[in-house]
């Protein structure tokens, strides 16, 4: 099939997005994928999961919910996606690729490739190689696991079966969503999580509220519980926990870990020595560290980099495409949303205390303990250099995620701590200290139950916390648990990314009656004069202004940050376009 400007290995969200964008820029592009074009998200993950959750919320029967799921996923038919790529000018090759040398790939054709019989090996040449092969499930080391009826998350989301008794192993996002799905449709669900709480990578209150909701749906939850042995029984299976508890079920659903899919890619031919389960190291421009040279470049996007979620994969793909096309662009991970689409849903973004607590050495421990634990719920690939679903689970992922964001959050000239500088009091607790130059977090909380919207719906189950950088006066992170939280927390993502001062955010008017009004309570607390107010330090603010002047965005004065006068708002409106010009999602 010859030479191409760009060869993309992997046809999931990241691979398809890169291929389409780069082909639109005039490059000759080949995309290599043996499975479904579009990856797991539209067929076996995000879309079928959300479809079933919505059907459950409407009180639909299981049979009708499965039929709707089939419609949403197109019956696992990717022909429409294939046609879109072809129209975009992308050459799609059904097969698996392996790097044989810098600039060279061999593709073993898979069934369904029309150009030649399956098994045929086709050589390709490239100038730019994009690794976007996603992630794969990791089976936990449980004695007898291979002898019992077990599902992966993907298998559970394409099966027509509704087990009478189901064990879900893993209390991360997918484990919680699947627990709610099957419990809502009548299964007796037991959720097993090795950590002491659900969603261990987020602040404790998020997992506690969600656990209460799942219990009300009928699920039984085992926290701090490690599965040790599985046995087949005449009517199903029995799962034994380390504390001696035994749980009977008809099927086990494994939602306890995934790892980057890098095996068999021939990365050693690029000079890369990748430890199994580890993510690819990349630069801020998503170029694979140590893999380029000799006139070729190697990029990575999506789960292979340890950056989770479909929207994060799409974002990285945009960064890769821009750089391939000559538009130099750095990725900014400071405001990537994380969502759990349960009822109530969980939304988080930026730096949060739960992740900050794990930022010390959890990532290193996770790498050392590869595959030694189970039931941790890290069903998505962990942060760069870590394995999801290990002993520290989502806490390890959160630790690396926080380290990455803390590096981004540091202002110019603040690589070293300022001796003697103390954080102001915080409520209810401050986040990471600044011995390494990272932000000091101040927390403000608001209950959704205090909003008229919640009272109208007779639903007081919800809470949000905002985390502000005490020195710069901008938001650093947020977590919200409540109905459809992702839909009304988007403004927080923008605020973190654009570094909008808290004092300006506190002056924003929210429609009545909405859950968004709860944001006003927390923002006014942060912008007020109490213990939770943020007070920008002169040193940090001067660094912010210097950085903005260098970028030509126009600095804000100290007075402007502390008092949202009209001229401050005017100056900040001038700042926003330049800041947001970096975002091309």
Task: Tell me the role of every PLM-derived stretch.
Residues 2, 40-126, 202-228, 354-355, ...:
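N-terminal Rossmann-like dinucleotide/flavin-binding domain of flavoprotein oxidoreductases
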Residues 4-6, 11-76, 181-201, 487:
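Beta1-alpha1 glycine-rich phosphate/pyrophosphate-binding loop at the start
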Residues 7-9, 97, 123-134, 168-169, ...:
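Short hydrophobic core segments
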Residues 9-11, 17-35, 40, 47, ...:
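Flexible, glycine-rich terminal cap/loop adjacent to redox cofactors
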Residues 71-78, 157-158, 163-167, 173-234, ...:
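Rossmann-like dinucleotide-binding cores of NAD(P)H-dependent redox enzymes
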Residues 91-94, 98-113, 124, 185-284, ...:
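A Rossmann-like FAD-binding core segment of flavoenzymes
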Residues 146-164, 246-247, 251-324, 396:
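FAD-site-proximal beta/loop scaffold in flavoenzymes
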Residues 583-585:
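Conserved small/polar residues in nucleotide/adenosyl-binding loops
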């Amino acid at each position: 099939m010859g030479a191409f400007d760009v060869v993309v290995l992997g046809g999931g969200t990241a691979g398809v997005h890169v291929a389409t964008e780069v082909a639109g820029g005039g490059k000759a592009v080949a995309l290599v994928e043996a499975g479904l074009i579009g990856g797991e998200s539209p067929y076996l993950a995000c879309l079928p999961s959300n479809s079933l959750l919505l059907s459950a919320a409407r009180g639909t029967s299981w049979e009708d919910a499965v039929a709707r799921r089939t419609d949403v996923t197109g019956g696992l038919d990717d022909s429409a996606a294939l046609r879109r790529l072809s129209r975009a000018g992308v050459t799609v090759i059904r097969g698996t690729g392996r790097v044989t040398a810098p600039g060279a790939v061999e593709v073993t054709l898979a069934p369904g490739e029309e150009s030649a019989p399956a098994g045929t090996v086709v050589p390709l040449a490239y100038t730019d190689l994009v690794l976007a092969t996603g992630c794969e499930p990791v089976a936990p080391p449980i004695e007898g696991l291979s002898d019992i009826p077990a599902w992966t998350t993907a298998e559970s989301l394409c099966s027509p079966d509704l087990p009478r008794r189901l064990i879900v192993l893993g209390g991360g996002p997918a484990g919680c969503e699947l627990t709610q799905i099957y419990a809502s449709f009548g299964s007796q669900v037991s959720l097993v999580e090795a950590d002491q709480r659900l969603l261990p990578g987020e602040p404790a209150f998020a997992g506690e509220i969600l656990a209460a909701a799942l219990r009300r749906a009928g699920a039984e939850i085992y926290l701090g519980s490690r599965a040790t042995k599985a046995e087949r029984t005449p009517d199903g299976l029995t799962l034994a926990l380390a504390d001696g508890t035994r749980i009977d079920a008809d099927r086990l659903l494994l939602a306890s870990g995934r790892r980057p899919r890098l095996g068999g890619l021939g990365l050693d031919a690029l000079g890369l020595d990748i430890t199994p389960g580890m993510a690819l190291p990349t630069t801020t421009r998503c170029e694979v560290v140590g893999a380029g040279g000799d006139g070729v470049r190697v990029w990575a996007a999506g789960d292979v980099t340890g950056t989770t979620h479909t929207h994060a994969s799409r974002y990285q793909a945009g960064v890769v495409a821009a750089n391939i096309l000559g538009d130099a662009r750095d990725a900014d991970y400071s405001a990537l949303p994380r969502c759990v689409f349960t009822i109530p849903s969980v939304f988080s973004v930026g730096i949060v205390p739960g992740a900050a607590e794990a930022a010390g050495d959890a990532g290193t421990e996770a790498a050392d303990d590869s595959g030694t634990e189970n039931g941790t719920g890290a069903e998505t690939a962990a942060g760069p250099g870590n394995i999801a679903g290990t002993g520290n689970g989502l806490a390890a992922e959160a630790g690396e995620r926080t380290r990455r964001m803390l590096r981004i959050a540091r202002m110019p000239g603040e690589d070293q701590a300022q001796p003697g500088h103390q954080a102001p009091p915080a409520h209810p607790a401050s986040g990471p200290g600044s011995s390494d130059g990272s932000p000091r977090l101040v927390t403000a909380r608001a209950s959704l139950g205090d909003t008229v919207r919640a009272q109208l719906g007779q639903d007081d189950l919800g809470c949000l916390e905002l985390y502000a950088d005490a020195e710069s006066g901008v938001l650093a992170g947020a977590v919200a648990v409540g109905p459809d939280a992702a839909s009304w927390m988007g403004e927080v993502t923008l605020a973190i990314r654009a570094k909008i001062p808290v004092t300006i955010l506190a002056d924003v008017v929210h429609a009545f009656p909405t859950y968004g009004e709860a944001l006003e309570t927390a923002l006014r607390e942060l912008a007020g004069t109490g213990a939770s107010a943020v007070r920008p330090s002169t040193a940090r603010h001067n660094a912010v202004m210097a950085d903005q002047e260098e970028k030509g965005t126009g600095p804000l004065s100290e007075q402007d940050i502390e008092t949202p006068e009209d001229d401050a708002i005017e100056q900040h409106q001038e700042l926003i376009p330049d800041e947001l010009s970096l975002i091309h999602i």
